[in-house]
């Protein structure tokens, strides 16, 4: 039974998130998505994004960072965080798709989606889009 649990843990790690998130430093004044590096990339690429400080009486926004292919098919969800804290963050994408397998070489797009959960701009989305390139591994 112990080996079965270890096997499940291994496959959960293998097929779970294809990104990791690290806090970088002080929050920006507006939402931002910086160009990935390296670009083009082979096995992984890092993307930095930022969320500004939100007033204490306001709900923090929902933030998503999503990778799409050239056919607008979702390939990876790097961040999907409700009540996202303010700050600058770095996400590393290991070129894995939503199915857990490595994506094909080609052009991809990283999109920052910000959904307001309260206030006068309730439900409004803010989108920022970057073009990236994956090379053959």
Predicted regions and their residues:
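C-terminal tail/sorting-segment detector
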Residues: 18-24, 32, 37, 47, ...
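Short, compositionally biased serine/threonine- and acidic-rich segments at solvent-exposed termini, linkers
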Residues: 2-7, 12-26
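Alpha-helix termini
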Residues: 11, 53-59, 98-100, 116-122
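Aromatic/hydrophobic beta-strand junction motif of beta-rich domains
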Residues: 45-57, 93
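Exposed beta-strand and adjacent loop surfaces of beta-rich binding modules
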Residues: 60-65
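Acidic, glycine-anchored loop motifs typical of Ca2+
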Residues: 40-41
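Short, surface-exposed loop/turn motifs with a glycine/proline- and acidic-biased composition
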Residues: 80-120
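Short, glycine-anchored, charge-dense loop/turn motifs used at functional sites
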Residues: 68-75, 108
């Amino acid at each position: 039974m112990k080996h079965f649990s270890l096997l499940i843990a291994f496959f959960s790690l293998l097929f779970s998130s294809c990104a990791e998130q690290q806090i970088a430093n002080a929050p920006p004044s507006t939402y931002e998505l910086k160009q990935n590096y390296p670009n083009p990339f082979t096995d992984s690429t890092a993307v930095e994004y930022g969320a500004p400080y939100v007033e204490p009486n306001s709900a923090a926004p929902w933030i998503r960072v999503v990778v799409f292919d050239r056919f607008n098919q979702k390939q990876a969800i790097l961040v999907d965080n409700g009540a996202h804290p303010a700050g600058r963050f770095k996400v590393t994408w290991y070129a894995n798709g939503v199915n857990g397998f490595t994506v094909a070489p080609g052009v991809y797009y990283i999109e920052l989606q910000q959904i307001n959960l309260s206030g006068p701009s309730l439900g409004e989305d803010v989108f920022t889009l970057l073009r990236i390139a994956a090379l053959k591994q």
